[in-house]
C-alpha cells in the first residue's frame, strides 16, 4: 500500500506537466498575485533531470502530457492555483517571515518560487523516505534548482533530513507515525514562527485515527498558523455515487484505498475534522467565483471541453480548506 500511495506523486507531477504543456499553468493568478517567475522552466528542468535518473518515471510523465483529457487539465489548474494563492496570501501577510511545512510533499516545486521571492522564508518538505531521496537526487543534479532553494553539492545529508539547506529542508517521515513526525518537526522547524501547513491530497490516504492525530498534534505544536488542505470528498447526497465509484476504481485498478472518503463526504463533515473554524470551497465553487472571466475565456481556447456538466461533477467532489489558529 505504501508504494502505491507513493506512486500517486507521479500522477500529480504528470498532471502538472500536462497542464503546463497545454498552457493552463502558470495562471494569471500565479504570475500576478503570487509573483511566480520561471514556473515553467523550473518544472521542465526537474523533468529533464528526472529523465536522466529514471526513464521509466519520465516516460510516465511525458505520456500524460499528450493523453490527459481537458476535464483533467481543468482540475489540475484549479487545484494548483487555489493552493498557490492561499499559500501566498499567508506568506505575504507576514512579509515572508514565516515557514511552510508541506506534509506529503512529493515532487511539489513551490519552494523554488517562494524561497527565491522571500529571502526570510523557511520551507520544509516531508514525505516517505523513498520519495524524498529521489527528490533530493533530482534537485542536487540541477544547478538552477539548487540555486533557487539555496542548496549546494556540499549541503549536508542526515538519516531523516536528506537535504539540509539554510532555509530549505527535505525530511523523510511517515505521516502515520505522529510521534516520530513531531520529533522531526521539533528538530527542524521553529514552533514560534508563523507556520502554514499544506496537505494536498494527503489526508484522504491516511487511516482516520492517523489523520486526526496528525491534525491535532501539528496544530498543537505551532503557536500560530494556518492549514491548507486539498482533498476529494465522496459526496453527501443519497443519489451521489461519485465517491463509491471512485473508491471501487482505485481499489480495483490501482490497489489504492481512501479510508475516509465516504466518512468526510461533504464540506461540513470535512471541515469538522479541524479544531478551528475553517473556510472551505469545492473546486467548482472556486472555479465559478475566484477565476476571472478573462482566465475562463483563455482556458476555453486551450482545449475543447465537451461536457461542462462533467467538469462540474468532478470539481464538486474536491475541496480546498483553509483554517487558522
From Swiss-Prot:
**Cross-referenced SUPFAM superfamilies, in alphabetical order?**
S-adenosyl-L-methionine-dependent methyltransferases
Instruction: Please verify whether the record's keywords include Methyltransferase.
Output: yes
Kindly state a single biological-process term from the GO annotations of this entry. Answer: protein-containing complex assembly
Keyword set includes Transferase: yes
> What Pfam families is this protein classified in?
LCM
User: Could you tell me the keywords of this UniProt record?
Assistant: Methyltransferase, S-adenosyl-L-methionine, Transferase
* Annotated catalysed reactions: [phosphatase 2A protein]-C-terminal L-leucine + S-adenosyl-L-methionine = [phosphatase 2A protein]-C-terminal L-leucine methyl ester + S-adenosyl-L-homocysteine
Provide a Gene Ontology MF annotation, just one.
Answer: protein C-terminal leucine carboxyl O-methyltransferase activity
Quick one: which residues bind S-adenosyl-L-methionine? 79, 104, 127, 174-175, 200
Per the record, the similarity remark reads: Belongs to the methyltransferase superfamily. LCMT family.
> What is the recorded name of this protein?
Leucine carboxyl methyltransferase 1
> What is the species of this protein?
Eremothecium gossypii (strain ATCC 10895 / CBS 109.51 / FGSC 9923 / NRRL Y-1056) (Yeast)
| Lineage of origin | Eukaryota, Fungi, Dikarya, Ascomycota, Saccharomycotina
| UniProt gene name | PPM1
